[in-house]
C-alpha cells in the first residue's frame, strides 16, 4: 500500500474556479490541452500568446479568447505558465507587475521556481499541476472521458486557497479522473530531471546505441541490430507499463528471463549506479541547472552539436529505411 496522498474527482471542489478567470500562457503541447480541457469544463479561459505567435490562429480556431501574455494575466485570477522552461523567466518579467495579491501563479514543472529563476511576490499563490503525459494524450483522454495521472504541489499559499485551486484545476483538465499525487516543487523537479537524464532519455538511448554498435561491430547486420536493440524496446516497455517488471518477466520466454536476470546487472553494475548517483547530485546541487542556463545564454552551442551528432548516428538512417519498408500497426 502506498503512502502517497492521491486525489480523485470527489476530492476536488470545482466551484472554487466558478468566479475565476484562468490564463494559459502558451499553446504548445501542454498549453493547448489545458486550455481546451478547461474550456470544456466550463472554466473561463484566456490564452496568452505573443502578437506574432504562430499558435494564435490555432487557439482562435479552437474557439478560445486570445490576448498577449500580459493582457491575459491582467484578466486572470490564476495564471498557468506553460511556455518552455527556458522562456518562462522572460515571460514572468512581462506579467509580474500585473499579478494581484491572492492571484495564483501555476506551473507544470518546478525548474524555475526550485532553482530561483523566478521569484514570485510573497502575496501570490504558487502551485504546480503537472500531467504525467504529453499534451495530446491529456486532451485525447479528456475527450474519451478518461483521465491522465498528474502531480500537485503548493510552493506558497498566502491566500489559504492554493491547494483547493490547484486541485480544482487538475480536475478541470481531467487529471483527477485518473489520480493526482501530492508532491513538492523540489521533489518533482529533481526526480523529473534525474529520470530524464539517467533513465528515460539519456540512459535508454545510450544503452540502445551501445547495444546496436556492439552487434554491428561484431559483424551482424545493422537491420538485425536495430530490431533487437531499438524496435523491440517498445514491446518490452509496454509490458512494464501495463504491469511492472513482473508482468514483463512473466510474458517473455524463459530463456529471455534467465538471460536478463543473470546478465542485466553486468551492464548496469555498481559503476553505473555510481554514475547515476553523480547525475543525481548534479541535479540536487544545481550544477545541471547552472549548466543548462549558461548553455541557453550562450546560444546553445553544445546542445546544437550534440543534437546533430544524434541525428547523424547510423541507427537513425537504418531505422528510417526499415520503418518505410514495413506495414506498422497503429500500436
From Swiss-Prot:
Pathway: Amino-acid biosynthesis; L-isoleucine biosynthesis; L-isoleucine from 2-oxobutanoate: step 2/4; Amino-acid biosynthesis; L-valine biosynthesis; L-valine from pyruvate: step 2/4. This is Ketol-acid reductoisomerase (NADP(+)). The keyword Oxidoreductase applies. Disulfide bonds: none annotated. Mg(2+) 2 binds at residues 192, 228, 232. The active site is at 109. GO terms for cellular component: cytosol. Binds 2 magnesium ions per subunit. Keywords: Amino-acid biosynthesis, Branched-chain amino acid biosynthesis, Magnesium, Metal-binding, NADP, Oxidoreductase. Residues 4-183 form the KARI N-terminal Rossmann domain. It catalyses: (2R)-2,3-dihydroxy-3-methylbutanoate + NADP(+) = (2S)-2-acetolactate + NADPH + H(+); (2R,3R)-2,3-dihydroxy-3-methylpentanoate + NADP(+) = (S)-2-ethyl-2-hydroxy-3-oxobutanoate + NADPH + H(+). InterPro entries: 6-PGluconate_DH-like_C_sf (IPR008927), KARI (IPR013023), KARI_C (IPR000506), KARI_N (IPR013116), KARI_prok (IPR014359), NAD(P)-bd_dom_sf (IPR036291). GO terms for molecular function: ketol-acid reductoisomerase activity; magnesium ion binding; NADP binding. It holds the Pfam family KARI_N. Involved in the biosynthesis of branched-chain amino acids (BCAA). Catalyzes an alkyl-migration followed by a ketol-acid reduction of (S)-2-acetolactate (S2AL) to yield (R)-2,3-dihydroxy-isovalerate. In the isomerase reaction, S2AL is rearranged via a Mg-dependent methyl migration to produce 3-hydroxy-3-methyl-2-ketobutyrate (HMKB). In the reductase reaction, this 2-ketoacid undergoes a metal-dependent reduction by NADPH to yield (R)-2,3-dihydroxy-isovalerate. Substrate binds at residue 253. One of its GO terms (biological process) is isoleucine biosynthetic process. NADP(+) binds at residues 27-30, 50, 53, 55, 85-88, 135. Its cofactor is Mg(2+). It comes from the Archaea. Residues 184-329 form the KARI C-terminal knotted domain. SUPFAM superfamilies: 6-phosphogluconate dehydrogenase C-terminal domain-like, NAD(P)-binding Rossmann-fold domains. Belongs to the ketol-acid reductoisomerase family. Its EC number is 1.1.1.86.
Amino acid at each position: 500500500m502506498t503512502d502517497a496522498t492521491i486525489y480523485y474527482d470527489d476530492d476536488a471542489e470545482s466551484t472554487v474556479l466558478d468566479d475565476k478567470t484562468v490564463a494559459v500562457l502558451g499553446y504548445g503541447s501542454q498549453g493547448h490541452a489545458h486550455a481546451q480541457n478547461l474550456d470544456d469544463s466550463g472554466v473561463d479561459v484566456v490564452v496568452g500568446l505573443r502578437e506574432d505567435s504562430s499558435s494564435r490562429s490555432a487557439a482562435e480556431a479552437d474557439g478560445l479568447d486570445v490576448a498577449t501574455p500580459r493582457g491575459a494575466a491582467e484578466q486572470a485570477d490564476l495564471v498557468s505558465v506553460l511556455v518552455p522552461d527556458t522562456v518562462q523567466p522572460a515571460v514572468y518579467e512581462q506579467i509580474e507587475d500585473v499579478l494581484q495579491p491572492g492571484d495564483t501563479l501555476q506551473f507544470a514543472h518546478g525548474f524555475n521556481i526550485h532553482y530561483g529563476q523566478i521569484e514570485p511576490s510573497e502575496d501570490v499563490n504558487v502551485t504546480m499541476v503537472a500531467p504525467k503525459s504529453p499534451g495530446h494524450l491529456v486532451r485525447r483522454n479528456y475527450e474519451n472521458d478518461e483521465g491522465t495521472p498528474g502531480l500537485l504541489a503548493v510552493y506558497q499559499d498566502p491566500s489559504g486557497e492554493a491547494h483547493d485551486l490547484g486541485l480544482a484545476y487538475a480536475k478541470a483538465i481531467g487529471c483527477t479522473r485518473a489520480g493526482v499525487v501530492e508532491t513538492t516543487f523540489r521533489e518533482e523537479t529533481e526526480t523529473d530531471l534525474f529520470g530524464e537524464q539517467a533513465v528515460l532519455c539519456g540512459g535508454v538511448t545510450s544503452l540502445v546505441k551501445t547495444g546496436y554498435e556492439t552487434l554491428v561491430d561484431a559483424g551482424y547486420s545493422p537491420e538485425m541490430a536495430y530490431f533487437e536493440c531499438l524496435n523491440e524496446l517498445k514491446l518490452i516497455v509496454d509490458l512494464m507499463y501495463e504491469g511492472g517488471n513482473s508482468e514483463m518477466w512473466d510474458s517473455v520466454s524463459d530463456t529471455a528471463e534467465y538471460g536478463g536476470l543473470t546478465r542485466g546487472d553486468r551492464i548496469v553494475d555498481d559503476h553505473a549506479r555510481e554514475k547515476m548517483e553523480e547525475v543525481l547530485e548534479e541535479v540536487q546541487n544545481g550544477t545541471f541547472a547552472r549548466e543548462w542556463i549558461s548553455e541557453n545564454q550562450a546560444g546553445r552551442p553544445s546542445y546544437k552539436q550534440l543534437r546533430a551528432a544524434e541525428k547523424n548516428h547510423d541507427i537513425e538512417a537504418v531505422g528510417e529505411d526499415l520503418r518505410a519498408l514495413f506495414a506498422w500497426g497503429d500500436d
